[in-house]
């Protein structure tokens, strides 16, 4: 029986937020109250919750463990679960317009007002306001337990001077793989918004943390072992930074090219459980550019690559006398804003150098950020016309979510399909080889990105697992 009294509930010792990776970025689906003493049951009949100034809809309240997982029986934690969508996620990340990166919010105020909290049959009121920016629980990033940085001095070809550079790394190293078979390594290169000095952001900004979840890990095998190492690497500016500190246009060489190779090599050398013949490189947007850039510069190192919405330009863009790109701001964000020199940046020599590397490209035909007809499509066509026979392309019509089925994302966000494990089909290479117009022979489809299979494999990850030097 519920008592008529409504005393102030004073059994709460602390409050945390659960941060989770979603297809749109991080969200906060739960508030976790740490208690001074265990309770067996809890419910709430009314109340309100706001996180970071947004009103949230409470969907459930229950006893839980320290990570917010529902428990049966007594516990010294209570979870307040909230509806979470792309429009109301309560993200603790904010976009820094000056740096062109995500960063953690300076504060994350959480306010809970509960006039009818029922705990073990007793009626209470509960009210609290807590800044939770430093009170985060995030299993999605905590499983990436190996954090490091690599610093070295390299020639900046733009300035002509030596420059000290640092790359930050974060790795998923499952204990179940240690000491047995040599296992594959999946390397992830982030997009523009995830640069900086906190590699956790590379996992949450676009759900790269999914690479360590069972659904994807289960595709990777070595002998009787299941799983892969995952290494996410973060640069402090942009992978497309050619040395002037700006986000380049993709027809140049990244200033991070050498240090990235050294960072990868050091990780592989220091982790003897990694199979050097099964190193898979992938990235999206800026990271897709860098994936192709690394193949061009180190074509014999990687066993396979999976660039998404890659921004390595097929064409060479004109430059000013100081080396910066010529851009006509009056033309807006379009190909008309840049000057084409008439030369190719993805030359025949580069195509020949990388055509034997197993590759799987993914893009959405409505990408309005990295235009497919100037980047991924002509590059892919040149590869298959040159005889690349283990090179695949998935093309989607647009980007629709599953974490939030009502959400429709910008066409550039095709990594949503990658991390949702929805890249299952490929385009017809013969039609692309024969195409003579700017449609490149592709037939976009949201049913896996294509109607054919890649050498009989069911999806990108199964194909990736089969690749070895």
What is the predicted role of each segment?
Residues 202-217, 290, 294-357, 453-455, ...:
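Mobile cap/lid helix-loop segments that gate and shape the active-site cleft of serine hydrolases
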Residues 27-44:
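A short glycine/threonine-centered beta-strand motif
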Residues 185, 192-258:
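Active-site machinery of serine-nucleophile hydrolases
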Residues 180-181, 243-285:
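Gly/Ser-rich "nucleophile elbow"/oxyanion-hole loop immediately N-terminal to the catalytic nucleophile
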Residues 91-93, 181-182, 196-204, 241-248, ...:
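Short, solvent-exposed loop/turn and secondary-structure capping segments
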Residues 360-469:
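C-terminal catalytic histidine-bearing segment of alpha/beta-hydrolase fold enzymes
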Residues 2-30, 53-183:
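A domain-start/cap signature at the N-terminus of enzymes
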Residues 189-191, 309, 363-364:
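The conserved beta1-alpha1 loop
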């Amino acid at each position: 029986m519920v008592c008529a009294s409504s005393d102030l509930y004073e059994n709460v010792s602390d409050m945390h937020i659960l941060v989770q990776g979603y297809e749109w970025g991080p969200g906060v689906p739960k508030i976790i109250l740490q208690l001074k003493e265990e309770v067996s049951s809890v419910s709430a009949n009314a109340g309100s919750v706001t996180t970071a100034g947004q009103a949230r809809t409470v969907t459930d309240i229950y006893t839980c463990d320290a990570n917010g997982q529902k428990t049966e029986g007594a516990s010294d934690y209570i979870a307040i679960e909230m509806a979470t969508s792309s429009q109301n996620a309560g993200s603790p990340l904010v976009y820094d317009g000056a740096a062109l990166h995500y960063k953690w919010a300076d504060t994350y105020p959480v306010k809970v007002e509960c006039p009818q909290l029922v705990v073990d049959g007793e009626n209470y009121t509960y009210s609290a306001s807590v800044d939770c920016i430093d009170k985060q629980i995030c299993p999605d990033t905590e499983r990436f337990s190996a954090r490091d940085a690599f610093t070295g001095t390299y020639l900046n070809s733009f300035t002509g001077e030596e420059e000290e550079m640092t790359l930050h790394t974060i790795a998923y190293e499952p204990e179940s793989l240690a000491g047995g078979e040599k296992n594959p390594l999946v390397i992830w290169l982030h997009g523009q918004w995830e640069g900086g000095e906190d590699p956790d952001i590379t996992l949450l900004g676009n759900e790269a943390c999914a690479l360590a979840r069972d659904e994807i890990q289960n595709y990777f095998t070595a002998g009787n072992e299941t799983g892969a190492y995952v290494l996410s690497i973060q640069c402090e500016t942009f992978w497309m930074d050619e040395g002037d500190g700006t986000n380049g246009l993709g027809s140049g060489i990244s200033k991070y090219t050498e240090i990235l190779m050294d960072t990868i090599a050091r990780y592989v050398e220091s982790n003897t459980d990694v199979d050097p013949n099964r190193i898979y490189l992938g990235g999206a947007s800026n990271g897709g550019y860098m994936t192709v850039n690394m193949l061009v510069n180190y074509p014999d190192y990687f066993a396979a690559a999976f660039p998404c919405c890659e921004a390595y330009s097929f064409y060479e863009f004109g430059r000013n006398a100081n080396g910066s790109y010529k851009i006509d701001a009056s033309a807006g964000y379009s190909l008309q804003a840049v000057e084409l020199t008439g030369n190719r940046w993805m030359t025949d020599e580069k195509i020949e150098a990388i055509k034997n590397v197993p590759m799987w490209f993914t893009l959405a035909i409505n990408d309005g950020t990295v235009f497919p007809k100037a980047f991924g499509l002509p590059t892919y066509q040149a590869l298959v016309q040159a005889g690349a026979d283990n090179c695949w392309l998935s093309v989607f019509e647009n980007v629709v979510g599953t974490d939030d089925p009502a959400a429709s994302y910008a066409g550039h966000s095709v990594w949503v399909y990658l991390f949702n494990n929805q890249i299952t089909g490929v385009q017809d290479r013969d039609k692309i080889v024969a195409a003579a117009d700017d449609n490149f022979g592709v037939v976009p489809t949201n049913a896996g990105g294509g109607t054919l299979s890649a050498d009989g494999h069911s999806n990108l990850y199964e194909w990736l697992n089969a690749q070895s030097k």
